[in-house]
């Protein structure tokens, strides 16, 4: 009999992840509050159920993919009364470190194996099954979770104990936000100096300016054919999600006493970008703000 997995949160990331578990041979019982998400998951072979309790009733493992820390705490508190002590719990949401550690603590009394395992790779990686998982929890929990995670991704990095996965995700995405702002500024400067996009790309992509924000998610059309800039900035990773992660980084910076002035500046830029109505665009579209081309977007 196939291993049964309860999957809570079938949205843009969770839905494709659950579908990949089905493709890998798992029986997946899924729950989401949004009917459209449930319908999409059901079409991919997920057995959609009406409650969280139904999703985890026979589950040997539970995966949660939820919007924020408060949602994870609420669901994991409920799970403490629903799951067996042998159940493996994996949270793939991107949340603050304190909430991640609290979630682990909620299940400590049940002696369940727990893991925070946020992801990198965006919706494209979720659909393709190429996500990277940043795992926080015991070595035993990570080892038990590995076959499940490998059905949804290509790389698993155990970053440390409880909360370490979230810490790694926040730090990584602060790097991404800062580097994208820097790449965009460089293209804006090049435009003013009469240097073509292609020329700058060819130099920077093979020199010390090389980075993912340039070579994979290039913010101008042309140099990287598959980048969102060539598709009207439809998001692979939205500006709103980048802002969420930058805010989490700033919260962590404040609570830990770390100095992150560039992260703070990036958060301010993306905050303004979202306030102007562009949060649904790819985060590389911040280049329009840096060009001074944006006014408030109206529906």
Which residues make up each language-model segment?
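Methionine-biased hydrophobic packing positions in alpha-helices, especially
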Residues: 13, 17, 65, 92, ...
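Rossmann-fold dinucleotide-binding core
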Residues: 5, 10, 75, 94-173
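Hydrophobic beta-strand scaffold residues
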Residues: 28, 48, 114-115, 156, ...
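NAD(P)+-binding Rossmann beta1-loop-alpha1 motif at the extreme N-terminus of oxidoreductases
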Residues: 1-65, 82, 86-87, 123, ...
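Rossmann-fold NAD(P) dinucleotide-binding segment
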Residues: 52-114
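Helical "substrate-binding/catalytic lid" subdomain
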Residues: 165-265, 269-294
């Amino acid at each position: 009999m196939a291993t049964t997995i309860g999957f809570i949160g079938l949205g843009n990331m969770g839905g494709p992840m659950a579908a990949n578990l089905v493709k890998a041979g798992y029986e997946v019982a899924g729950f989401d509050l949004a009917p459209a998400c449930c319908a999409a998951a059901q079409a991919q072979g997920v057995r959609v159920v009406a409650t969280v309790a139904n999703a985890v009733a026979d589950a040997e493992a539970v995966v949660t993919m939820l919007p924020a820390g408060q949602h994870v705490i609420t669901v994991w508190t409920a799970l403490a009364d629903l799951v067996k002590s042998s159940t493996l719990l994996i949270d793939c949401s991107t949340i603050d470190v304190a909430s991640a550690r609290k979630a682990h603590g909620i299940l400590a009394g049940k002696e369940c194996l727990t893991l925070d395992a946020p992801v990198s790779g965006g919706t494209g990686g979720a659909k393709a099954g190429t996500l990277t998982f940043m795992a926080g929890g015991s070595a035993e929990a990570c080892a038990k979770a590995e076959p499940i995670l490998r059905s949804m991704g290509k790389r698993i990095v155990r970053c440390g104990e409880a909360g370490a996965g979230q810490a790694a995700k926040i730090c990584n995405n602060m790097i991404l936000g800062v580097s994208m702002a820097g790449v965009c500024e460089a293209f804006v400067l090049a435009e003013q100096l009469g240097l073509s996009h292609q020329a700058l790309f060819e130099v920077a992509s093979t020199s010390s300016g090389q980075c993912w924000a340039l070579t994979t998610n290039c913010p101008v059309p042309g140099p990287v054919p598959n980048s969102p800039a060539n598709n009207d900035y439809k998001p692979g990773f939205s500006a709103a999600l980048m802002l969420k992660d930058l805010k989490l980084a700033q919260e962590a910076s404040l609570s830990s006493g770390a100095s992150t002035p560039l992260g703070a500046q990036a958060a301010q830029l993306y905050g303004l970008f979202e306030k102007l109505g562009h949060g649904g665009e790819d985060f590389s579209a911040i280049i329009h703000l840096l060009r001074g081309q944006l006014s408030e977007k109206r529906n």
